[in-house]
Amino acid sequence: MNTRSTFLASTLSVILLVLPVVSSAKPPKPTEEAKLQAKLFQKKLSKDEQVLHALDRLTFGPLPGDVERVKRIGLKKWIFEQLHPDRMTENPGLEAQLQVLESLRMTPLETLQHYPGPQMIRAIANGKQPMPDDLLLRASIERLITRYKVKQAEAAGLAAPPKDANADLEPVRTLEQILTPGELDTIRKGNPEQKRQLLESMQQDRLEDMLIAMNQKQRTQLFGAAPSPIRREIFLLNSPQQVVAYDLLDSKMLRAVESTRQLAEELDDFWFNHFNVFYEKGADRFLIPQYEREAIRPHVLGQFRDLLEATAKSPAMLFFLDNFESVRPDIDLNDTKRKVKRGLNENYGRELMELHTLGVNGGYTQKDVTEVARCFTGWGIQEPRKGGGFFYNDKLHDKGQKVVLGHVIAAGGGMEDGEQVLDILARHPSTAHFISKELAQRFVADNPPEQLVNKMAQTFLATNGSIREVMKTMLDSKEFWSEGAYRAKMKSPFEMVASSARALNANVIDGWALANQVGTLGEPLYRKLEPTGYSNLGTEWINSSALLERMNFALQLAQNHVESVKVDVSRFGDDPNAVAKILMFRSMSPQTRAAIDKALEDSKQKNAAMVAALVIGSPDFQKR
């Protein structure tokens, strides 16, 4: 049996062994063992367990040295730091990596101009937009224009344009003219590290000439070995809009793995899912970077009312839930100079109450949904497909009287009608309870004690929705520091991948490949179609198929088979329990230890990488 077959066989045996253990590790349903669970939430953790619990819940998993640091400065001081991220010094290495990701700092209009989508490509092809000056972008657009014209010709039943119809498309020089024979051999036959060294050594003009001379397949084959800046150039040549997606994925993984402001990153993920928008929906491809940068990240520990308004006025949300097209029902279409029929759209009004504030059982009716939708008519985007910002059009607003949850909003109002709705919802007791429960489900347990949720909700109402104060109430509670919460949640794919990289102290050169792994495990980042966002319930992420993928990921990571992620497992040795104490800061359960011992015995591959992979893929590591 060859090495590849042996590897696959050992992987399968491991998964078959750990599946029963993971299944038994699922927490009981709410109706089961209720008395036992209530007692567990009364039992206090030891001091050492409290440190591990804080690092498991308030970070994407501990780095080597984190436990010692928390013990040294004290748990209270460490929590205070995490609750005040603006006072912390960020990891300078992370900041340097993020600096390369230019689209994250651009306005939507700048993003469109630098990384155009199909609409702008067509505009340039038809002479309505100028060709950009940037050499790589120009080459990409010329290629895309040719593809567009070929499709046009095919649709019209005409002959395709001749190859020289766009002379600029043809490479000025071939690869043989640009590269030396040795360089050509490295590009075609070298291993990833040899290719990376060559790419990093090339001057920028030669590098650009080479990438332009390559076809799309050749550039794609080079992608795995390319460092981050060159990967972005490859994306730019293949499809400019891919750069924006690349930057989003790269930054999200880098921040989760490397940021010192771990709680802020946890909350960024929480709030983005709470106010979810879908990357693949039209203009949201270039609106999301601004959305996360300006509507989500500044408010993760701020006032909920500010966060609510920031998302309500964000072009990304207005576009995703179609509110930019919502107008008063009696609108005179001739006044708007539009041929497309428009009317009242209730999507945002419904999701605002059901998902963003009150919750599905929050006490609203269908009549309230309609009234809220009327209040937000006229809230739109200035030229949405051209990167415009929030724009209120009074001509499209319904000026009649509305009644929302028993509150009368007088006739004759304007944009303030929607703002009044946000006020009503932000201070509503149902919102306080719903938000508190969602936070408790993320950070405490899938079924958090109602007593804790009520305490958090009281703080929410007393502080006008201070997220920081609600989090402090949770962190000051006996329930958070109890056996009922300790290792009671299962990691989402995002948490599993990030915590694995952190536990192994991985050198993440580029977060894109890790983000792809998250997608493979079932949580493609920024691509949740439904406005619900991804679930906070850990039990929803565990099934046999998902566990197989998690074990495969662990094996790839530990054996350095994940692109642009380097780990050193030589320090671990091959004793599973010793490795578990390094990676999890605790011993394995007897069931997991027995399963791993059996897997190692059967596979005959007992080495540091295999042992580390089995620990990371084990049910014990899936818990947090």
Task: Locate predicted features.
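Sec/Tat signal peptide C-region and signal peptidase I cleavage site
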Residues: 21-25
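Flexible, low-complexity segments enriched for small/polar residues
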Residues: 26-39, 43-47, 52, 56-66, ...
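Bacterial N-terminal signal peptides
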Residues: 10-20
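Alpha-helical scaffolds flanking conserved acidic
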Residues: 266-267, 305-306, 469-470, 608-611
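Active-site substrate-binding loop specific to GH73 endo-beta-N-acetylglucosaminidase modules
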Residues: 26-37, 176-182, 186-195, 199-242, ...
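N-terminal accessory alpha/beta regions
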Residues: 64-270, 274, 279-290, 295-297, ...
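Bacterial N-terminal signal peptides that target proteins for export
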Residues: 1-11
